[in-house]
Design a protein with these regions (language model features):
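A short glycine-rich beta-alpha junction/loop motif
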Residues: 58-65, 100-127
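Sequence-specific dsDNA recognition surfaces
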Residues: 2-36
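Amphipathic alpha-helical segments
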Residues: 80, 115-155
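A generic structural signal for residues embedded in beta-strands
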Residues: 41-42
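Short, surface-exposed loop/turn microsegments at beta-strand edges and helix-strand junctions
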Residues: 1-7, 33, 51-66, 71-74
Length: 166
């Protein structure tokens, strides 16, 4: 049996059944295959949904949208990933959605998605943009990690100070 995947704002991750969080299907018979390099998109909730490129082989909900780029030689996957993630973050997809937003279900219909215009610069420019964003994101994550380690040290110091003084 294939491993189940969830699409979160942290990316596509293996479904954790141990913590009883999230939704569980009665049957996984209709789940769709997701291969490494496939795009998977939660288009059912444009406020908390997300899109990512899978790093895993597995299956995901039949309600998610799984797709690949048509022209892998002329299209840089990371460029399109960042473009679509920006459309979530900036609520561009939200403006095209329909449904019950007050109930947390604002969907991007297939026809709106398939006819959505995305700028297509030459491949070299796509790659340059994607590499720039990836480099900056990696740098930011390193800085966040450093800050988190520093915060942890201060928290430990605070505890030891209280212990020593009291």
């Amino acid at each position: 049996m294939q491993e189940k995947k969830s699409i979160t704002q942290r990316g596509i991750i293996p479904k954790d059944f141990s913590n009883n969080e999230g939704q569980f299907a009665n049957s996984y018979a209709n789940y769709q295959l997701v291969h490494k390099g496939d795009f998977a998109m939660n288009h059912m909730d444009l406020l908390t949904g997300w899109v990512d490129i899978s790093k895993y082989e597995g299956v995901t909900s039949p309600d998610y949208r799984v797709f690949v780029l048509n022209d892998k030689n002329g299209m840089c996957p990371k460029y399109y990933l960042y473009m679509m993630q920006m459309c979530y973050s900036a609520r561009i997809f939200y403006g095209l959605g329909q449904g019950v937003s007050g109930m947390g279900r604002w969907r991007l219909q297939a026809d709106k998605f398939l006819n959505f215009y995305i700028p297509i610069p030459p491949y070299d420019e796509q790659k340059k943009i994607a590499d720039y964003i990836t480099d900056k994101v990696n740098h930011i994550e390193v800085e966040i990690d450093k800050r988190n380690k520093l915060i942890k040290k201060y928290q430990e110091y605070k505890k030891s100070l209280i212990y020593e003084v009291v």
